[in-house]
């Protein structure tokens, strides 16, 4: 009888611990000497090229910290799942990473609409989800949950930086918004409209939102030309940006495109001279005049010398995941644990020195506060034989930071 009671207690204890692990109240891998990072991203479909490189940036960060002895005395394991760039798939894969792979922390993913779905799984199971990529303002704004930390700026910051550049470095007055019909594009459209008010005499001469993964941009670019727009404002990325730029060139559109992710070397290798003179805006633009970033590029390329230099160059997305994970590792070290409650407490309000300057994780919305960089696409550059970014200029954080009261986040006053 006593053996039966003891056996029953063991079974009940096991069930209790399992329940705690699933709820996120204790680190799932505390007992087996490893820390699991679960990554969800687009590694198939039309945006596979981006997801593949993001994965490489994450792996580089993990390999680097493991080579230094690991994190909290444990080796870090990266488990990657494919979102297929679909919200429902991302939720399913995030849930699998938490329940089956016992992920201590989640990271991802391309597509704000995809991450908005994925972050609900993080909240349900009380697991911190780090976002080094998706920029829709609603992620840390109206849809905020306390398990999300974003190490990339919002559409509010991106659009403010874009308009700040045009206000300071150009005389353009006629603007046309052309974005994806998705969370990122819609949030960006609102941000562009709000920030255009800062340019005296500016005109919004057109506004369109196109389907994601669009093949034919000719009807949209024809409308841009007819409007007399001097600038196309967009947050397009991947094929949607490449096709937009190529169509501009084919139809003889003279407008400057700004706000998108044209520092993607895969896209620039494709569009070539059609990209000349367009504007790149990003907080972590690599500047080889910066010794820290120059060493990062050199070390990264040396380790990955057998891979295609253009495709796997650490200048787009790769560095965002790398730097985002470095900051996450720092927060875990200061928390002394991957326990979600402790990690949240340690990361809220924390500052970190990035190669481009000091950044802060704003406590109320878990949003990075950072300066921005802007650069034009030029023919002769330090990176590639095809056109790429020239020397960047810095846009101070005080010019682009969205005030807490304007984020749509109920915690921010």
Report the location of each language-model feature.
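Beta-alpha junction/loop-to-helix N-cap segments that form part of ligand/metal-binding clefts
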Residues: 49-56, 70-141, 151, 210-217, ...
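Short, low-complexity disordered leader/linker segments with a strong preference
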Residues: 1-36, 67, 407-413
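Immediate post-signal peptide segment of exported/extracytoplasmic ligand-binding proteins
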Residues: 26-39, 68-75, 167-173
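Extracellular/periplasmic periplasmic-binding protein-like sensory domains
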Residues: 245-322, 329-338, 387-413
């Amino acid at each position: 009888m006593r053996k039966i009671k003891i056996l029953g207690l063991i079974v009940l204890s096991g069930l209790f611990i399992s329940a705690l692990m699933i709820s996120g109240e204790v680190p799932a891998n505390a007992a087996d000497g490893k820390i699991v990072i679960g990554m969800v991203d687009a590694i198939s479909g039309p945006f596979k090229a981006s997801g593949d490189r993001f994965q490489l940036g994450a792996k580089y960060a993990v390999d680097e910290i493991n080579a230094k002895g690991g994190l909290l005395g444990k080796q870090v394991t990266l488990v990657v799942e494919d979102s297929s760039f679909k919200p429902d798939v991302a939720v399913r894969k995030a849930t699998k990473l938490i329940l089956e792979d016992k992920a201590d922390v989640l990271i991802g993913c391309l597509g704000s609409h995809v991450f908005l779905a994925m972050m609900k799984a993080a909240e349900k199971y009380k697991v911190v989800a780090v976002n080094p990529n998706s920029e829709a303002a609603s992620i840390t704004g109206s849809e905020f949950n306390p398990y999300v930390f974003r190490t990339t700026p919002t559409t509010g910051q991106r659009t403010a930086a874009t308009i700040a550049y045009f206000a300071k470095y150009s005389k353009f007055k006629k603007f046309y918004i052309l974005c994806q019909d998705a969370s990122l594009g819609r949030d960006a459209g609102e941000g562009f409209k709000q920030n255009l008010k800062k340019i005296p005499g500016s005109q919004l001469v057109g506004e369109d939102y196109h389907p994601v993964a669009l093949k034919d941009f000719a009807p949209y670019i024809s409308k841009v030309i007819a409007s007399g727009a001097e600038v196309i404002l967009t947050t397009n990325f991947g094929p949607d940006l490449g096709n937009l730029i190529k169509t501009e060139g084919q139809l003889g559109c003279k407008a400057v495109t700004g706000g998108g992710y044209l520092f993607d070397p895969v896209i620039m290798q494709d569009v070539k001279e059609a990209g000349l003179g367009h504007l790149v805006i990003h907080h972590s633009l690599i500047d080889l005049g910066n010794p820290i970033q120059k060493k990062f590029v050199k070390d990264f390329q040396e380790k990955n010398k057998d891979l295609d230099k253009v495709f796997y160059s650490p200048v787009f997305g790769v560095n965002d995941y790398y730097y985002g994970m470095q900051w996450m590792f720092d927060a875990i070290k200061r928390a002394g644990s991957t326990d979600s409650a402790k990690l949240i407490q340690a990361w809220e309000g924390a500052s970190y020195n990035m190669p481009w300057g000091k950044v802060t994780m704003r406590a109320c919305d878990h949003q990075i506060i950072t300066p921005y960089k802007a650069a034009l696409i030029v023919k002769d550059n330090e990176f590639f034989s095809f056109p790429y970014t020239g020397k960047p200029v810095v846009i101070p954080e005080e010019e682009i930071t969205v005030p807490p009261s304007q984020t749509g986040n109920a915690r921010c006053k």
